[in-house]
Amino acid sequence: EKAYKELGTVTAIMAGCVILAVLPNAQNMYAQWDLGQNSIRGATELTTTTPSGEKISSGLDKDYAFAWSYGKGELLTLLVPNAYGGSSGGMLGPDSELYKELRAKGAQVGKEVQAPTYWGEKTFTSGPVYFGALVCFLFVLGMFVIRNPLKWWLFGGSVFLILLALGRNFDSFNDFMFHYLPMYNKFRTVEMALVIPGMVFPIIAIWGLKEVLSETVSDALLKKGLIAALA
C-alpha cells in the first residue's frame, strides 16, 4: 500500500509539473496546432499517392518527411563535427586545396571561398548536429559511474530518438513509427529528433562528473569507465 501511495504521489506531482509547463505556452501551442490544420501537415479532403505508392490523407508523405534523414555514418558528427564535410555552403580558407587551385587558375577569390563541403546523402544541409567530444566522453563515463537506474531511462530515450532521426536509413523501424507514432509524420525533418539527445548527453555528462568529483566511485569502476570512454 505504501508503494502505491508513493507512486500516486509521484504521478500527481509529475502531472502537475506538466500542466504548469504547458499553461504558459498554451496560446502558442494552440496557434501552432490551428495553423497545422491548414498546412501540408494537416488533414486534406483528398487522398494522394506518393512516388512509393503510399496513400495518405493527413500529415506529410513519407518520402517528403524522410528527405532529411540522418545517415548512419553521419552519427559520427555527434563526436566529430566535420566528419561529413560540414555544410552545403562551407567556407574554405587559404590553406585549403580548393582555394589554392582556384587562385592558381586565376579565379577572383577573397580571404575565403564558399563551397559545398558536405558530402553526405542529404540534398543539402546547413551543418551537422554536434554534441561535443568532451560531452560524449563524459556521457560514456557517466553511464558507468552513475548508480541511479534513472540513467537507463535517459539512455533508452536517447537511443529511441536517435533511431527516429535516421528516418529512411532505418526504415524497418521508422516505417512503423511514421504510421503509428503520434506527430512523427508532422516533423519538419526527422533529424530534429536529435534535439532531445543533445540535451540528455550533457545531463548524463555533468551527473557523471559530479559522481566522480564526490569520490563515491570505486577506482575499479572509474578505470573501467575511463577505458570505455576513451575507446
Annotate the PLM regions:
Residues 136-143, 201-213:
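Transmembrane alpha-helical segments
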Residues 2-10, 100-113, 138-168, 217-227:
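Membrane-interface helix-loop-helix junctions at transmembrane boundaries of multi-pass membrane enzymes
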Residues 116-129, 160-200, 213:
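Membrane-helix boundary/interfacial segments in multi-pass membrane proteins
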Residues 18-28, 69-88, 152-166, 228-231:
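Hydrophobic alpha-helical membrane-insertion segments
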Residues 5-33, 48-56, 159-160, 224-231:
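Hydrophobic alpha-helical membrane-interfacial segments at the cytosolic entry of transmembrane helices
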Residues 27-142:
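Periplasmic/ER-lumenal interhelical loops and adjacent helix-loop junctions
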Residues 5-13, 17-22, 61-66, 126-129, ...:
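Hydrophobic alpha-helical scaffolding
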